[in-house]
Amino acid sequence: MRHVAVYAGTRNVYACMAAAAKSLLHECRQIDRVYFLTEDDAFPEELPDVVRCINVKDSFTKAGSVNYENPWTYMTMARLALHRILPDEERVLYLDVDTIVMFACDEIFDADLDGNVIGGVREPKRCLDPFMYVNAGVLLMDLEKLRSGGFGDEMMGIANRRKLKCPDQDAINLICQGRTLELNPIYNASDWTQLPMNAKIYHYAGVRNYTEYKLFKNYMTMKWRDVHASEI
């Protein structure tokens, strides 16, 4: 199974996107492809061959749509359209640009979804059993099932016609309820989920000025050519 990761963001977070991807490539040595979903045809810095930049501006939501203006950016909803944006990929790991891979986590790419369409880490403060609400910052997504079952289009549809507090995340949880595998919190450790000591992926969810943290700054200043050689 291909190990494919996806990041998405507007121009103001391109540097963060690069830093997050560098942390992934530094720790995980079996990555086949990294996609950067951006607003431009070219990235402002030269990228290694494993990284491909795709301009998705206006390809999944239109200015003026009900959730286009939200506390984050319209690009947060790109994850709802991955089944269309990446028609040749069967499965991807979506990561927010404010995530840092702390330790090798190659195994998550091959995790058994047990027939579910996505896997995510629960937000215990946002839900009451039996409703499981997952944080969308790290998602293992079966794009093939999202396409064949129509769930991807359903997520896009509800996000474009119904006002939601957290548009992308709410749409995913509404449509994929009962079709979501709960992942170990080590794969999305944050104040919104849990903070296990052995976390493999840390998510700076809701953290202001996260780029000022030493680890994030180290990856922001790291050269692509040094990703596999540098010690952090």
Predicted regions, residues:
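A glycosyltransferase accessory/donor-loop signature
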Residues: 1-9, 18-19, 36, 141-232
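Glycine-rich phosphate-binding "P-loop"
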Residues: 3-13, 63-68
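GT-A fold catalytic core of metal-dependent nucleotide-sugar glycosyltransferases
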Residues: 75-133, 140-144
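Short, polar loop motifs at secondary-structure junctions
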Residues: 38-43, 104-105, 124-125, 186-189
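Active-site-proximal specificity loops/subdomain of glycosyltransferases
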Residues: 43-84
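Short internal beta-strands
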Residues: 33-39, 120
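Short, solvent-exposed loop/turn segments at the edges of secondary structure
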Residues: 133-136, 197
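Short, acidic, metal-binding catalytic loop of nucleotide-sugar glycosyltransferases
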Residues: 23-31
